[in-house]
Design a protein with these regions (language model features):
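N-terminal subdomain of nucleotide-sugar transferases
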Residues: 1-66, 424-432
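Acidic anion/phosphate-binding donor-loop and adjacent secondary structure
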Residues: 36, 212-229, 250, 414
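A short helix/loop element that forms part of the nucleotide-sugar donor recognition site in Leloir-type
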Residues: 56-63, 218-232, 388
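Membrane-proximal helix-turn-helix segments that form the acceptor-binding/catalytic region
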Residues: 110, 129-132, 136-140, 167-186
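Carbohydrate-associated surface elements
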Residues: 189-192, 211
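Nucleotide-sugar-dependent
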Residues: 249, 297-307, 312-335, 341-353
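Nucleotide-activated donor-binding/catalytic signature segment of Leloir-type glycosyltransferases, i.e.
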Residues: 270-273, 278-305
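A charged, aromatic-enriched C-terminal amphipathic alpha-helix characteristic of glycosyltransferases
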Residues: 367, 385-412
Length: 432
């Protein structure tokens, strides 16, 4: 691979353990390991707790440059920008947070414009508005502008009523359309999202799904023996939700299902993670006087594979409004460990098609508490070995980190634009 200078502008980055920051960190690490010269403009790590990690202390109030070294000795330059991190990430506070990063990153970009030229500038949405900085660099210095969409942030804010002002939504949609029209390459993580993005910009959109390291996350034999490590009996049936605890998941349904199953002493519900709505769930647990629900902190990466193997059933929940606006990143890791997931997804969405086509999970309608409860009851007493094997097979075939990154960037790094266009069909055939 030809050595290139690559700039990533993103609101989340390593060492954030989950979500977009995790994928941004792994992507840049892989690119650096291929011999590329990589720079990152980002925030201080704050997600999913919505609190800057304590190791950064008071440094987070000003700019900081770090150097990360990958295994081949190649350095990654990371420029961290100060930004507002709200304790209560409401719709308004999230907007303020993102725009505070936008303006602090803008100052960094003013300096980078006078440095050695980057061949590619990648911005990852959300935050969607960072694409404006990609356009700025492209117009002044040239190079390819790549706009990758992890969440259809504006659509989700509208459909989930996170932002209720139509004026603000329309302004944001106009900015998004402007960014999409100026991007050289647009990509996103699911087939359903590709269709939605294509309708916005009327141009080709590449498939760049989230991935998993299938060598790090794998099924463990005798996984029931791991349960005592986390305070459970070997005979307990563990229903696990592990991930961000936010508004778009509708996690209250877990607690109401637990209330209905209090007479099943062998069924235990574990909620692992952090997020702005965790306190609400803990309060609801206390209100319902639940003894079968356990809140666990984020697990360290070195034991995360064992932890995921503890679960008999995984929960992947989203409200109906989320639809094809987001694709839960936790699913790839669940599939890689051979986990069986109960997934809330509507017919016609990418998530529904993925799960149903591979016979590797149990599908229920979003926002249907009765259907979720029935699925849990039926699943814990069923033989699900085939579902588990199908999940692992799907991950090995479709979600391998090296395969996805190599396939995608082999297309992106085509020197001539007509070469990129001619490779789109090949990319889809490889990954889809």
């Amino acid at each position: 691979m030809i050595k290139r200078r690559i700039l990533l502008i993103g609101g989340n980055y390593s060492p954030e353990p989950t979500g977009i920051g995790k994928y941004n960190g792994e992507m840049i690490k892989w690119l650096a390991e291929q011999g590329n010269d990589c720079t990152v403009v980002t925030t201080y790590p704050y997600y999913p707790e919505w609190k800057v990690q304590s190791s950064y202390g008071k440094q987070c109030f000003w700019y900081k440059t770090e150097t990360q070294i990958v295994k081949n000795g190649n350095p990654i330059k990371v420029i961290r920008c100060p930004h507002f991190v709200p304790k209560n990430p409401s719709g308004l506070n999230r907007m303020i947070s993102e725009f505070s990063f936008f303006f602090s990153a803008y100052l960094v970009m003013m300096l980078l414009l006078f440095k050695k030229k980057y061949n590619q500038v990648i911005t990852v949405a959300p935050p969607f508005e960072m694409g404006l900085l990609g356009i700025l660099y492209k117009k002044i210095r040239g190079g390819e502008f790549i706009y990758h969409i992890q969440d259809l942030q504006i659509d989700a804010a509208r459909d989930l009523a996170i932002i209720k002002s139509k004026v603000i939504i329309n302004i944001f949609l106009s900015i998004e359309k402007f960014i999409l029209s100026h991007a050289d390459i647009v990509s996103t993580i699911s087939v359903g999202m590709i269709k939605k993005v294509r309708n916005k910009c009327q141009k080709e959109v590449l498939f760049f799904p989230n991935w998993v390291d299938v060598n790090t996350f794998y099924p463990v034999a005798n996984r029931h023996d791991l349960k005592p490590n986390y305070g459970f009996d070997t005979t307990d049936k563990i229903i696990l939700y592990s991930g961000a605890i936010g508004n778009k998941q509708g996690l209250e349904a877990i607690l109401y299902c637990a209330k209905s199953l209090q007479n099943r002493k062998d069924i235990k519900f574990a909620i692992c993670g952090s997020g702005p709505y965790k306190a609400n769930l803990i309060h609801l647990k206390e209100k319902l006087n639940l003894k079968n629900v356990f809140f666990l902190p984020l697990q360290p990466i070195k034991t995360f594979n064992s932890f995921l193997n503890v679960a008999d059933i995984h929960l992947v929940l989203q409200k109906s409004g989320a639809g094809d606006l987001v694709m839960p990143s936790k699913l790839s890791t669940i599939l890689s460990v051979g986990g069986v997931a109960i997934v809330t997804a509507s017919k016609g969405t990418s998530l529904y098609e993925v799960i149903s086509s591979g016979n590797m999970g149990i599908l229920v309608e979003p926002d249907n508490e009765k259907a979720l409860l029935d699925a849990i009851i039926n699943s814990v007493d069923s033989e699900l070995k085939e579902h588990s094997e199908n999940a692992r097979l799907y991950a090995e075939k479709n979600l391998s980190a090296y395969k996805i990154l190599d396939d995608f960037f082999s297309v992106v790094f085509k020197v001539e634009r007509n070469q990129v266009k001619s490779s789109i069909g090949e990319l889809r055939a490889k990954i889809a």
